[in-house]
Amino acid sequence: MLFRSEIVVPAGDGAEAFVSVEDIAAVAAVTLTEPEKHAGRAYAPTGPQALTMAKAAEMISAAAGRTIAYRDTDREEWIAAMVSSGLPAEYAQVLRPLTATLASGNGARPNRDVLDVSGKAPVTFVEFAAKTAPAWK
């Protein structure tokens, strides 16, 4: 959640190998159009580098030309704030384990799924930040 030039999320110092929606779509498209080749396989596409939220905020700041800070917060307070902002309570509950995974660093191991399945290197976070910079201004 972006609030007053801050990314506020209960992630602590956990790292994540953030993956772009384009890369997820590329993997999905290949597996759906070549089902025999991918039958019985499971993929967990990742980006090429694991980053903490603080490092991600630094990269977004550089691309956007303004400071975007990361602020860790208490998970339960964050969920309550999301619900009070209009997020359905049922969906907010789904965020509890997702943010716990982020905080634990369980998603911090980049893999080759995007490259191996789609044939192209995954989008870097710097590329993502540059592409989405207008949204952060």
Predicted segments — roles?
Residues D113, A121-K137:
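Amphipathic terminal alpha-helices
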